Amino acid sequence: MITLPARPESLTFAPQQSALIVVDMQNAYASQGGYLDLAGFDVSATRPVIDNINTAVAAARAAGMLIIWFQNGWDDQYVEAGGPGSPNYHKSNALKTMRQRPELQGKLLAKGGWDYQLVDELTPQEGDIVLPKPRYSGFFNTPLDSILRSRGIRHLVFTGIATNVCVESTLRDGFFLEYFGIVLEDATHQAGPAFAQQAALFNIETFFGWVSDVESFCHALSPATPLSLAKEKRYA
């Protein structure tokens, strides 16, 4: 068992009965020229997030945690995205961008394309699970719940993009299914202005889960990992 310093309080769990979830670290969300960038969102600050996710993944894997990678998107004909009868058709900024710029049709979030691929710096390894998802929540129309329950996993540590969209949506759905959700705030990034990140983290720590950071996570998994005095005081 480990005790992870977090807000609003520390959380104790067994790493071997927990999962680290990496949400949508695709070129679409983290790279210049990807969907978010083309849709007008700022992705310039994603580099530290990628590095922090790599650090968290390495620590989790060494501790025996299951690593689950999500990729958001659809078939290249966008049948899975839903037609005009689906709210997703009207609210997905990727679909709206392609309607505004027809030359991008078949390129944004299409399975098999560059936009859909995970960024080069993040590579799943043998034993990890990679799951496609067609909507914001990783629980919708995916086997995530079955995968977790069959392994006795109840604690989920979240990283990825976007904090205020797919990360929060998946954590919220997990809360309703009796999962304990923890977000590593410096291993996530928002879609939109900075206040969207802060609002999502406020919602999570106040109503749906817990908020921690990569340094505290790594130190909890391996106490030999140094923890700064500032972090010790932060969660005291």
From Swiss-Prot:
What CDD domains does the record tag this protein with?
A: cysteine_hydrolases
- Which reaction does this enzyme catalyse, per its entry? (Z)-3-ureidoacrylate + H2O + H(+) = (Z)-3-aminoacrylate + NH4(+) + CO2; (Z)-3-ureidoacrylate + H2O = (Z)-3-aminoacrylate + carbamate + H(+); (Z)-2-methylureidoacrylate + H2O + H(+) = (Z)-2-methylaminoacrylate + NH4(+) + CO2
Q: Which GO terms describe its molecular function?
A: hydrolase activity, acting on carbon-nitrogen (but not peptide) bonds, in linear amides
Keyword terms? Hydrolase
Judging by the UniProt lineage, the source's domain of life is: Bacteria
Q: Name one GO biological process term.
A: nitrogen utilization
Supply the EC number(s).
Answer: 3.5.1.110
Which Pfam families does this chain map to?
A: Isochorismatase (PF00857)
Keyword Hydrolase assigned: yes
Q: Which InterPro entries match?
A: Isochorismatase-like_dom (IPR000868), Isochorismatase-like_hydrls (IPR050272), Isochorismatase-like_sf (IPR036380), RutB (IPR019916)
The record places the active site at D24, K133, C166
Stored PANTHER family = ISOCHORISMATASE-LIKE DOMAIN-CONTAINING PROTEIN, PEROXYUREIDOACRYLATE/UREIDOACRYLATE AMIDOHYDROLASE-RELATED
Q: Which family does it belong to?
A: Belongs to the isochorismatase family. RutB subfamily.
- Task performed by this protein: Hydrolyzes ureidoacrylate to form aminoacrylate and carbamate. The carbamate hydrolyzes spontaneously, thereby releasing one of the nitrogen atoms of the pyrimidine ring as ammonia and one of its carbon atoms as CO2.
User: What protein is this chain from?
Assistant: Ureidoacrylate amidohydrolase RutB
Q: Which organism is it from?
A: Klebsiella variicola (strain At-22)
- Lineage of the species this protein comes from: Bacteria, Pseudomonadati, Pseudomonadota, Gammaproteobacteria, Enterobacterales
